[in-house]
């Protein structure tokens, strides 16, 4: 293993973190700490710099598969696993921050949360978020994952859990694996169906959101009075 060689002009990234805090470190320095070591011919700082230059933004790291990470020169099996674990942990931390004693105040708030959660899934996922009288989350549940024979859940599957949890309202969210968030005719029909079923049971359907990797569509925001 080959460790980073310090430049005479400055401290090593780990030393800078200890003395000045993680927030002052550059992306290159933080990535170098995660990578830990370079190769015989390249320091870990140079490797980190090369990796970052090959990306449009840090967000690209979250989109690379293990195989794609291993194709980067200097990134073997172990480093690719460590990077993937770091990215997943960062996602979970952000989701945990969003969920902490969270009261749902807007569709945008939910969309931000769900873009992280299911926005980049290769299959369609339908999630129901069940809320109490104060719009606090009781439970978030993946109700359906798309398959060959079915592409959307039935209202009864969603409402079964709503009744069990004694939820007073709910939000339905699903992703489009294509990344586009505009509703199809099936999406509109499904929304009409779930809204009628909720009304029949006295449960408020606050919204149906469609999310992609970086965009979303809200039936409540886009359709006046949520009338479909």
From Swiss-Prot:
Pfam families: RadC, UPF0758_N. It comes from the Bacteria. SUPFAM superfamilies: JAB1/MPN domain (SSF102712), RuvA domain 2-like (SSF47781). A motif (JAMM motif) lies at residues 174-187. Gene3D superfamilies: Cytidine Deaminase, domain 2 (3.40.140.10). CDD domains: MPN_DUF2466. Keywords: Hydrolase, Metal-binding, Metalloprotease, Protease, Zinc. Residues 103-225 form the MPN domain. InterPro entries: MPN, RadC_JAB, RuvA_2-like, UPF0758, UPF0758_CS, UPF0758_N. The keyword Transcription does not apply. The keyword Zinc applies. GO terms for biological process: proteolysis. Zn(2+) binds at residues 174, 176, 187. GO terms for molecular function: metal ion binding; metallopeptidase activity. NCBIfam families: PRK00024.1, radc. Belongs to the UPF0758 family. This is UPF0758 protein STER_1430. It comes from Streptococcus thermophilus (strain ATCC BAA-491 / LMD-9). The lineage of its organism: Bacteria, Bacillati, Bacillota, Bacilli, Lactobacillales.
